[in-house]
Amino acid sequence: MVQSKTNTKGWVRYMRVLVACEESQVVTIELRRLGHEAYSCDLMECSGGHPEWHIQGDCLPLINGYCGFYTCDGLFHEVGSKWDMLIAFPPCTYLTAASAVRLRPGGILDPGRYEQLLDAACFLRLFFLLIVIELRLKILFR
């Protein structure tokens, strides 16, 4: 396990990083190459070839750190503090303006796509709500 280390200027050089909503592991692999302890997390299996760095499941219980999880290779990992960095790729397939065009093909609302849009928006709202709550608690209890 890589420990967080600082250089002579006090900057963190090696970090614990959660890359949420990433099944491809492109970012996770690059962060690992740079020496960081990075984990990808997605509801789907990873396609990047490193199950030892992938958490298959919901990222919401993990985003504030202080958690334990199993990677896809079956090993248990524990994060005893906050993540040093959080990177997230929410499901933009249903959240972008470009996706709105596909919401009403032929002028008729696609109920399946609309439901996926609502699910993605709810997930994104919960994701940011958890981060905001964490920041407010940090300010309150300084």
Task: Label each residue range with its predicted role.
Residues 1-142:
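Conserved active-site and SAM-binding loop architecture
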